[in-house]
Amino acid sequence: MKKFRLFALSLFLPFAFAGCSDDENEKEYQVELDAVVKNVHTNLQTSLGTDVPSLSVYIVSPRGTYFSTAKGANGAAVTPYSYFRFASNTKNFTSTAILKMMQDGWLKLDDKITDNIPGTTVPYTPDVADWNFPHKNEITIRQILQHNAGIYDLTNDASQYNIGGETYADYMLTTNPDFQFSASDYVKLLKDHNLTYGTPNTVYHYSNTGYTILSEIIARVYSQKVNSNKTYGDFMYDKIVGPSSVKPLAITFPELASDKQLPSPYIKGFIKYDTHDEITDLKNASAHIGEGNGVGTMAMLSQYIRTLMKGENVLYASSAELMRTNKGPATTNGYGLGCSNFQGIGYGHNGATEGYLSLMAYDPASDVSVVVLLPFWDLRGNNLNKCIATLNSTAIEAKRTLGY
């Protein structure tokens, strides 16, 4: 029962807020958007044959800022300021952190992860036996960002290594919900079981574990630069989203197994199984550090992705462009440096974890950003794919409603 998976989703798949006046055109946009979201939500419920708690979209455009939500019979009210676990959208934040360090001369994207941190005698990753996983000496920071490093994914993939048919992360979270995960914990398994997808730049394979390794690199680089022990979460707070960052946001990246409580107000996730249902909110996010442990709101994700892609946040416009376009040689889709290209929607990321599905994207051509939240997984048959596809279709329909 793979209820703890967190992954990137397929790339192919009544009121207005500040910035909108009360003229008739804007009122019509809101009415039309409400009707569109309600229709998509109703169609999803019909297709799944079950109640869907809610479906929400937050869109910022030259024509105004709009929010619309449709609630099922058993759903809770959602606002742009409701907190939720935004899962693999975290990878875009991790990429931003790496590129920020690149801008500041703290690291080089094409350094091997066994190289020393610039200006120090300390390597990017621990030089100990348990970290000698396959191809470690060949892997660069850029390749991990691009999912071209060949690093086996211990949280999504049970094909090469599993415990009773479950991924390592699933098994540990099921048997010991309070287990404190770490990058060292994961890489030891890679080493002990010789787990790999192949040599770098020969295969594209999405890897949560790769991004957890990046979180360790961020922590080690930051610790060296400030001469104090720091974590991934410390850098994210100090430099990317905290009060002293360019665009402060109340986004958090829980690292402790015990840090399970979401801020208020928050939306609970919901998972539907063949035999039972599960409400998800109090969860151990330490299994997903750097790749899926982010917590925030739709409004926060919108401000983040919009300012980031416009070069108005911590990254220069040139760095944001690099994030969008720098694909690996083995990549066959639109994935750059922790950034997806969603056709008809824009650049950003998406995510799925424990009853939550979400998407954030910005389209430079139209200056439109969109965030979609569906706090629901249906694990019966092939129904989860229908839920995932709804993220993209909602974003596309929302843009179309505003004329984009």
Q: Where in this protein do the model-derived segments appear?
A:
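Bacterial Sec-dependent N-terminal signal peptides
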Residues: 1-29
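Residues that line or immediately flank small-molecule/substrate-binding pockets and catalytic motifs
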Residues: 8, 59, 120, 148, ...
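Catalytic loop of the DD-peptidase/beta-lactamase superfamily, centered on the K-T-G motif
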Residues: 20-76, 202, 221-224, 230, ...
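Short active-site loop at a secondary-structure junction
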Residues: 53, 75-143, 196-209, 289-292, ...
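Short, solvent-exposed turn/loop segments enriched in Gly/Ser/Thr/Pro and often Arg
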Residues: 59-61, 65, 113, 255-258
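Short, surface-exposed loop or secondary-structure junction motifs
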Residues: 126-346, 350-352
